[in-house]
Each structure stands twice: as C-alpha cells, then as structure tokens.
Amino acid sequence: MNPWALEIQQVSKQFPDGTYALQNIEWSMTEGETMALIGESGSGKTTFLRLLNRLIEPTTGAVVIQGKPACLQDPIQLRRRLGYVPQDGGLFPHWTIKQNVCLVPHLLGWPLEQQLERLDRLLSLVNLNPSQIAERYPIELSGGQRQRVAVARALAADPPIVLLDEPFGALDPLTRHDLQDQFLSLQARLQKTMVLVTHDMSEAFRLGNRITILKEGCIQQVGTPHQILDAPATPYVHLLVQHFHAHRG
C-alpha cells in the first residue's frame, strides 16, 4: 500500500520560453499532514499547486495522488475530490453563500436535503451562523467572513485533500490570527491532508506539521519547524531563519 497521500516524482516544469518554474522536484507527504509551502514570488509555489490539481501538466516526471498517477485520473473528477481555497476566496459574487458552498455537492448529484445539511454543518464549523449567512452574497460579508466561507466550500464534498493558496494573506493581522486559530482547530478535528502556500515564515511554522521551502523552482529544505530552525540546510534557509528570529525579536 502506498504510504503517501501526495507525491511528486522527479518533476520539472518548463515553459515555452525555456525557463523552468520547477526543477527536479522529489517530494511527498502523508495522509492527515499539513505541509506549508513557502517561498518568494517566482519561487514556484503556484506552479506546485497547479500541478497537484492538474491545472497544468509536468514537462517531465509524475504527480501521484493517493497512490495513482494524476495523469491517469480524469482532471474534472480529480478537482472535485480536492478542496481548493484561492488567495481571494474565489467566491462567485452573484451567487448566495448557500449556492457557493453547495456547488461541488450539487455537481456530484447530492440530494438537496443532504446539501443543506452539509451547508449548515460547515458554516457552523467555521463559526458562521447559517441562518444569518446562507442567503447573503459575498459582497455583504467582511473579508474574514468570505475566507471562512471559502474554507467551508473547499470542505463541502468532504475531500481527503485540501489545497490553500495564501488563504489569509489579504487579511488584517487580527483577522489573520483568528483564522489561523480556526484553521488549527479544524485540522485537529478533521485530519485532512493540507497543502498551505504562504510567504509568511511565522505562519508556516505555526500551521505546518512540516515545511517545504522553495527558491527559484528548487526545493531548499523539507522538515518540521524545529528541524528547519535547528539545522537550516542551505544558506537561503539560514537567511530565512535569521529573518524569522529578527522579526520575532
């Protein structure tokens, strides 16, 4: 039995102009783990996520999801099994919160009663009142509320894997900290396999069981927060750790 929930096997992604977004990536994570993916703009973080949900294909190598090569899985069906939270929440502005959250269950053919039960449960799970929120539109909510709805939508069909692309990056510090607390509470309860992209080292250390550090399309280090703080593997990681300590101090 394959022990990995997600694997990237010797993957490179080259664009038509010859530049590489990712080079020789060998990476894996186990079921129920939260992996924080950190790097500067242009480091390959977004390409990494897009490979996982088959929005793009690798130039070489293979992406393996739950033991099966992604290239052998129908991309539409695959994405419906992967929860996804984009940076801006990605809610449809002219749909109600109910319509947004119930989208994937509806596409999967769930009975309406089951969809509504799931809606109530998930909104409550992310600390929103279903009776007050369900019929409202995204523009009527605060930024923090919209991100909570985006998380609820990503979990709607109970996917085993959830991808989060800078989910808290556009929020004020107080709301960001509150949603980080909510994320930790949800993960302790649900034990999903989570890939969280961030540019914030403190957020990566707080939310990730392990951390993958990218620079210019190459993995610099993968390890627990303690492993990275205690033994930076490259000069770049050492610099990040120095900045982290300076910011905290």
What are these regions, as identified by a protein language model?
Residues 137-141, 145:
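Conserved ABC ATPase signature
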Residues 216-217:
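Conserved ABC ATPase "signature" C-loop
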